[in-house]
Amino acid sequence: MSLGAADVGAGAGPPGQHAGAVDNWPVAIIGSGVVGTDLMSRIGNGDGRLRVSAMVGTNPHCDGLARAAAAGISTSPGGVDGLLSMPEFANIRLVFDTTNPGAHQSNWARLADTGVRMLDLTASAIGPCCVPAVNLDAQLDAPNLSMATCSAQAAVPIVAAVRRHGVVRYAEVVSAIASQALGPAERVTLDEFAELTTTAVQELGGARRAKTLTIVNPADPPMPMRTTVFCLVDQADEVARNEADVLAVVDGVQALLPGYRLKHRVQFERLGSGNTLYIPGTGEFGGTRITVLLEITAAGGYLPACAGNVAIVTSAAKATAEAIVERHAQTLKAKI
């Protein structure tokens, strides 16, 4: 994957330097590949509530560890064992795992008894699933929190918004992701990620039934990630409010990732007699089909623009960690 040359750590400073910072949590990143490096960049460009104190990987020659070292961050090629042996670990409050589902199980087994919080970007689903735009507050106390897949981060807020004004009988999510933005590990787990996305659309988005499709887009030059969300809704009396709620959640996600946007206006199609749809396992459907077309560009980090699939997860993880810091500060304040 061809990566940009954004400066890691730009805008970061010593604890307390950032005006209005609630706290300054030392965090560690496991995984020095594309995901970990983008996350490090986003934290470095953040408001100071988080500070990357350590990054570990397994390749001593990778770009991520080199960038971390250049930014003054302690590094180790020893993986989770290397992290545990670093003097900085004594002060680490939260660990991001950007490796893969199998490695995450081993990493969590090593860290679970240390008292650190874990944000899982591997979609291993050991902990509860989190889409910050939908269920952030309900999950902040979990010791291990699993960030939903890129397609779920994009689509679940839309489905949840539509669900406010009617029963979503069926939702379908179709994501096209640039071939250049998918590494070997992601390619072999596309089916697993689709299942996790479908589960999130139903459990967090509120759809009765759902389906997820992921298309690898071979276009060159590469295109940004595009996600289309179809919702079949029973009633159609709330078109204006549905559109307003969709626009509001797009604005909310856009605050986390500026590259998240509507590609076209929200589309509404009434389905009735002579114009019904057949849903396998459900039967004929008459009501309203709502279509939302999204484009997700990797803005503001280490990645090329086409890698919105990575950026939306790292941005969600950063926002979740910042909310954990905020919750911790509020809890301490309440005890004073």
UniProtKB/Swiss-Prot annotation:
Binding site for NAD(+): S32, G33, V34, V35, N309
GO biological process: one example: catabolic process
Name of the top EC class for this enzyme: oxidoreductase
The organism's place on the tree of life at top rank: Bacteria
Keywords: Aromatic hydrocarbons catabolism, NAD, Oxidoreductase
Keyword Oxidoreductase on entry: yes
Catalytic reactions of this protein: acetaldehyde + NAD(+) + CoA = acetyl-CoA + NADH + H(+)
Entry GO MF terms: acetaldehyde dehydrogenase (acetylating) activity; NAD binding
CDD domains per UniProt: ALDH_C (cd23933)
Pfam families registered for this protein in UniProt: AcetDehyd-dimer
E.C. code: 1.2.1.10
UniProt record similarity statement: Belongs to the acetaldehyde dehydrogenase family.
HAMAP family per the UniProt record, alphabetical: Ac_ald_DH_ac
Protein name per UniProt: Acetaldehyde dehydrogenase 1
